[in-house]
Structure formats: structure tokens, C-alpha cells
């Protein structure tokens, strides 16, 4: 069995790490490189960096910090933000990223997933999905351009359909960003994760809602995800990654402990 992964998420805007609640009202957390170093030292399995306004601003991720991160950490990291071409992805990988993630650009051009997978291999192509639960209809819908709340829009895709579509096109991994849960720290949406797990045959990463160590355990044992991504509990030092991994190991979760 592959070890489960603990993945800190660093949302980047204007060269700094920020964090919002339900993708709104972002506050500055700190500088990118020191945070990346701290998480690597604490025992993170990998890091994810989202340049959150790149797609809504119509630009590609700022590559200046990618190489600086690559110089100081020795764990894999994934970069996302406005990547719309094979060439742009190649640049980011050449700067030292191990994976690239696409979200809004894939919704605008689904064939981009296939072009990237064909060129670089499915193992380094991640598709991020920003999913919103509509309490009125009970349905889960995919949102686009979520880095800017003024430009965020609901797409015509329902979440489960989009999960199946991106796999057909070559996604090697899916990060499910559950917007309703984001930043509120009351647990991952296990019901939604189980629905997605049933149709997802590639590694699935849960994102949005972690507030306690038990929430990570629930995601692994109840929803059978491959990795759990979190931000605010790590940024605010509510949970230490090393202690979290020791707890999960004690609960029988297969996990890499430093």
C-alpha cells in the first residue's frame, strides 16, 4: 500500500502566502520560501503552491519564486496558476517543480490536459477542481476563476462528471477543493469525497476543512483518499505536521514518519 500524503497548501498572491475562508477575504500569512522550508523540515510529504489570481488576471504563475523554492527544499512540490500551454508548463518544470496543476485553464480548454499528459507524462499532471455544494439543489458544481471572488463563476459542469472527464483526458491526480469547507476547519466533506472516490481511479487529494487531527484520519479511513491537503491549520500552527503523522501512524494509517 502506498503511504498516505500530508500536503500543506500555500496560496500565493503578489509574492506572498495568503489564506482566505471559502476562497474570500484573504489575509497575508508570510513569505513563500521560509514557509516552504518550515513545512519540509516538519515532515510534509509534498507542497502545493497556487498562484491564486493568475488565471483570473490572465497571466501565468510568477516563476521567480519557483526556482528559489526548489533550491531550499528536498521534497516534491506542485505549482498551479494560469498555465495554459505545454510551453508554460515546461518552463515551470524546468525551474524545479515536480508537478504542475491546472484548474480554470482546463475548464476553458479541456484538451490542454491531454496535451500536457502526452508531453510530460500523467504522473506530473494534476487537475484541481473547485467544487461548491448547492444546498438548494443538493448538487455539486465546478467553479472557475475562484482566485478572484469578483470573477468567480459557476460552470455548467457538475463535479462528478468533470472528475470523470479529466481522467479520460489524462489527469494523473485530482485535488478536490471543497469550497464550502475551505478555511472553516470543521472537517472535510466526507460525503462528497466518497462520491468522488467511487468514480476516481487516480490518486485523490482532499482539500478544504481540516481543523483537527481526527479530520485527517476521517479523510483517510472513511473516504480513502490518497492525500490530505490543508493550509490554515499549518499556517497558524494549530497542527504540527510531525505530530500529525505520529498520530495517524498510531491509528493504523500507512504514512511516512521522519
Swiss-Prot record:
Any signal peptide, and if so, which residues? none
Active-site residues, record numbering mapped to chain: 11, 130
Highest taxon above the source species = Bacteria
Keyword Cytoplasm assigned to the entry: answer is yes
Q: Spell out the subcellular localization from the entry.
A: Cytoplasm
Pathway annotation: Amino-acid biosynthesis; L-histidine biosynthesis; L-histidine from 5-phospho-alpha-D-ribose 1-diphosphate: step 5/9
Q: What is its main location?
A: cytoplasm
Task: Tell me one GO biological process term.
Answer: L-histidine biosynthetic process
Q: What is its EC number?
A: 4.3.2.10
CC terms in the record's Gene Ontology section: cytoplasm
Q: What class of enzyme is it?
A: lyase
Reactions accelerated catalytically: 5-[(5-phospho-1-deoxy-D-ribulos-1-ylimino)methylamino]-1-(5-phospho-beta-D-ribosyl)imidazole-4-carboxamide + L-glutamine = D-erythro-1-(imidazol-4-yl)glycerol 3-phosphate + 5-amino-1-(5-phospho-beta-D-ribosyl)imidazole-4-carboxamide + L-glutamate + H(+)
The family database entries (InterPro entries) matched by this protein are listed as: Aldolase_TIM, His_biosynth, HisF, IGPS_HisA/HisF, RibuloseP-bd_barrel
* Function per UniProt: IGPS catalyzes the conversion of PRFAR and glutamine to IGP, AICAR and glutamate. The HisF subunit catalyzes the cyclization activity that produces IGP and AICAR from PRFAR using the ammonia provided by the HisH subunit.
Per its UniProt record, what HAMAP family does this chain match?
A: HisF (MF_01013)
Q: Quote the protein name from its UniProt record.
A: Imidazole glycerol phosphate synthase subunit HisF
The record lists the organism as: Pectobacterium carotovorum subsp. carotovorum (strain PC1)
Q: Please state the gene responsible for encoding this protein.
A: hisF
Amino acid at each position: 500500500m502506498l503511504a498516505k500524503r500530508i500536503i500543506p497548501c500555500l496560496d500565493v498572491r503578489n509574492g506572498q502566502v495568503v489564506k482566505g475562508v471559502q476562497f474570500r477575504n484573504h489575509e497575508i500569512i508570510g513569505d513563500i520560501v521560509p514557509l516552504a522550508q518550515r513545512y519540509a523540515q516538519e515532515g510534509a510529504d509534498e507542497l502545493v503552491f497556487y498562484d491564486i489570481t493568475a488565471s483570473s488576471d490572465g497571466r501565468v504563475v510568477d516563476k521567480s519564486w519557483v526556482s528559489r523554492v526548489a533550491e531550499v527544499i528536498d521534497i516534491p512540490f506542485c505549482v498551479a496558476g494560469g498555465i495554459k500551454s505545454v510551453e508554460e508548463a515546461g518552463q515551470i518544470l524546468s525551474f524545479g517543480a515536480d508537478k504542475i496543476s491546472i484548474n480554470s485553464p482546463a475548464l476553458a480548454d479541456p484538451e490542454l490536459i491531454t496535451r500536457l499528459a502526452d508531453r510530460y507524462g500523467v504522473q506530473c499532471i494534476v487537475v484541481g477542481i473547485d467544487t461548491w455544494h448547492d444546498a438548494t439543489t443538493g448538487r455539486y458544481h465546478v467553479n472557475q476563476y475562484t482566485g478572484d471572488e469578483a470573477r468567480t463563476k459557476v460552470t455548467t459542469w457538475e463535479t462528478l462528471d468533470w472528475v470523470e472527464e479529466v481522467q479520460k483526458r489524462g489527469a494523473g491526480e485530482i485535488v478536490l477543493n471543497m469550497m464550502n469547507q475551505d478555511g472553516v476547519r470543521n472537517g472535510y466533506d466526507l460525503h462528497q469525497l466518497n462520491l468522488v472516490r467511487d468514480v476516481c481511479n487516480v490518486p485523490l487529494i482532499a482539500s478544504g476543512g481540516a481543523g483537527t487531527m481526527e479530520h485527517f484520519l476521517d479523510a483517510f479511513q472513511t473516504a480513502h483518499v490518497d492525500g490530505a491537503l490543508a493550509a490554515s491549520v499549518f499556517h497558524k500552527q494549530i497542527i504540527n505536521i510531525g505530530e500529525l503523522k505520529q498520530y495517524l501512524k498510531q491509528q493504523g494509517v500507512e504514512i511516512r514518519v521522519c
